[in-house]
Design a protein with these regions (language model features):
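Extracytoplasmic
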Residues: 1-127
Length: 127
């Protein structure tokens, strides 16, 4: 990971730090998830290697979530299994398959700025 984070990404992390309750779960690409808990009180599905039980099994599921060919049912199954409250969507997530989260009914826009968006999920505590 780079020694710095893009300003727009840091701003998105800041939004989560203010809005997410401690312990809420965020789904994001590994690259994002590895940094996110250092900036916010959230948990991530697959992040810092030694602190993610089952990382080898979770990584392909997380990557597949963002693949355009993945079904809505498979996405929903991951959200349920991991009790995901928020989806983080930025450049790292876009590289995983080109899926566009804006049209999925299980997501509600919560934050958007530049190349970064955060969605609350239909699994979230306020759903």
């Amino acid at each position: 990971l780079p020694a710095f984070r893009p300003a727009a990404e840091v701003a998105a992390f800041g939004w989560l730090r203010k809005e997410a309750a401690g312990g809420e779960v965020v789904l994001a690409a590994y690259q994002t998830s590895n940094a996110l808990p250092a900036w916010t009180p959230v948990r991530v599905v697959a992040g810092h290697g030694p602190e993610t039980p089952g990382l080898a099994e979770l990584t392909p599921r997380v990557e597949g979530f963002f693949d355009v060919l993945t079904t809505a049912e498979a996405r929903l199954a991951l959200l349920k299994a991991e009790q995901v409250d928020y989806l983080f969507y930025g450049p790292a997530e876009r590289t995983l398959g080109g899926w566009d989260p804006t049209s999925w009914e299980c997501l509600r826009p919560a934050y958007a700025s530049g190349a970064y968006a955060i969605y609350s999920t239909c699994m979230g505590s306020d759903a």
